[in-house]
């Protein structure tokens, strides 16, 4: 749930391992 991935997912996917898309940013936990 924390925006610590430094990645956006405007296309709906996250490339960072362990991160999920919470549009429009990737989050972890």
Swiss-Prot record:
Biological process per Gene Ontology, one example term: defense response
Organism: Melicytus angustifolius (Hymenanthera angustifolia)
Disulphides: 5-19, 9-21, 14-26
Function noted in UniProt: Probably participates in a plant defense mechanism.
Cross-link (Cyclopeptide (Gly-Asp)): 1-29
Pfam families documented for this protein: Cyclotide
Family stated for the protein in its record: Belongs to the cyclotide family. Moebius subfamily.
Family matches, as InterPro entries: Cyclotide, Cyclotide_moebius_CS, Cyclotide_sf
Name under which the protein is recorded: Cyclotide mang-A
Modifications after synthesis and translation: This is a cyclic peptide.
Sorted UniProt keywords: Disulfide bond, Plant defense
Domains (record comment): The presence of a 'disulfide through disulfide knot' structurally defines this protein as a knottin.
Record keyword Disulfide bond present: yes
């Amino acid at each position: 749930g924390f925006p610590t991935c430094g990645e956006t997912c405007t296309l709906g996917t996250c490339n960072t391992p362990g991160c999920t898309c919470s549009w429009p940013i990737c989050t972890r936990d």
